[in-house]
Amino acid sequence: MPIIYTNIVLAFMISLLGMLIYRSHLMSSLLCLEGMMLSLFMMSTLMALNMHFPLANIVPIALLVFAACEAAVGLALLISISNTYGLDHIHNLNLLQC
């Protein structure tokens, strides 16, 4: 396995570890989730370039669309929680009533 793939997998694992360690704060969890999505995007882009298959180029773009939707929903939840409670703790998500 080339060194670039090893670095991308290592970046994903570090982001996953950060997600597990800092799971009590929403902002830290969102940043770790974005790091995971970035490493998945880089891995899928490299795989699509190595496959030389024209339809494989759609996968990284679709992944970016899902990452943007995830970021928008996460930031909306963060703003809602911080305006209501003044903190960004995850346990405040259970207290939101729509």
Swiss-Prot record:
GO terms for cellular component: mitochondrial inner membrane; respiratory chain complex I. Core subunit of respiratory chain NADH dehydrogenase (Complex I) which is composed of 45 different subunits. Core subunit of the mitochondrial membrane respiratory chain NADH dehydrogenase (Complex I) which catalyzes electron transfer from NADH through the respiratory chain, using ubiquinone as an electron acceptor. Part of the enzyme membrane arm which is embedded in the lipid bilayer and involved in proton translocation. The keyword Electron transport applies. Its EC number is 7.1.1.2. It catalyses: a ubiquinone + NADH + 5 H(+)(in) = a ubiquinol + NAD(+) + 4 H(+)(out). PANTHER family: NADH-UBIQUINONE OXIDOREDUCTASE CHAIN 4L (PTHR11434:SF0), NADH-UBIQUINONE OXIDOREDUCTASE SUBUNIT ND4L (PTHR11434). One of its GO terms (biological process) is ATP synthesis coupled electron transport. It is a multi-pass membrane protein. This is NADH-ubiquinone oxidoreductase chain 4L. It is an enzyme of class 7 (translocase). Keywords: Electron transport, Membrane, Mitochondrion, Mitochondrion inner membrane, NAD, Respiratory chain, Translocase, Transmembrane, Transmembrane helix, Transport, Ubiquinone. It comes from the Eukaryota. Its main location: mitochondrion. It holds the Pfam family Oxidored_q2. One of its GO terms (molecular function) is NADH dehydrogenase (ubiquinone) activity. InterPro entries: NADH_UbQ_OxRdtase_chain4L/K (IPR001133), NUOK/Mnh_C1-like (IPR039428). The chain crosses the membrane at residues 1-21, 29-49, 58-78.
